[in-house]
């Protein structure tokens, strides 16, 4: 029997490879082997529109557009509006968490986070 998430494809979008690669590896370990990567918001949008994905995990520090603007574009899009969107922040008191939640964020993590934090968030979303 395959893991419950083995068919779900998640896009990890972060301008820093040092952030993306460990997260992709962790997703594979948790049963999401189909993760893909983007280094900016426009690349993320292109990938999301060209290949089916069930989720996006991104940094609010994306560029062109930033993470919050990307989230808003996704929620306004008829083809992407139901995509599960998660973000990770550096500070629990970050005002961006409130803005992103109001814009339709499905879940978030605060750095540094542990494997079980990511697993709990993904389980709650799916």
Annotate the PLM regions.
Residues 69, 91-107:
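Alpha4 helix (beta4-alpha4-beta5 surface) of REC/receiver domains from two-component response regulators
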Residues 62-63, 93:
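The feature encodes the CheY-like receiver
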Residues 68-81:
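Short amphipathic alpha-helix used as the core "switch/output" element in two-component signaling
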Residues 40, 66-69:
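Acidic catalytic/metal-coordinating carboxylates
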Residues 113-122:
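C-terminal output helix
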Residues 7-18, 23-27, 56:
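Conserved acidic segment of CheY-like receiver
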Residues 37-55:
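Acidic, metal-coordinating helix/loop segments flanking the phosphotransfer/catalytic sites
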């Amino acid at each position: 029997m395959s893991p419950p998430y083995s068919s779900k494809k998640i896009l990890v979008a972060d301008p820093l490879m040092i952030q993306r690669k460990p997260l992709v590896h962790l997703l594979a370990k948790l049963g999401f082997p189909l993760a893909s990567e983007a280094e900016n918001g426009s690349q993320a949008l292109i990938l999301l529109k060209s290949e089916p994905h069930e989720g996006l995990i991104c940094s609010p520090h994306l560029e062109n557009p930033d993470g919050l603007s990307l989230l808003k574009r996704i929620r306004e899009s008829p083809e992407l509006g139901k995509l599960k969107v998660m973000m990770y922040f550096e500070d629990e008191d970050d005002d961006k968490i409130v803005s992103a939640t109001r814009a339709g964020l499905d879940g978030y993590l605060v750095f540094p986070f542990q494997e079980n934090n990511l697993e709990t968030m993904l389980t709650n979303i799916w």
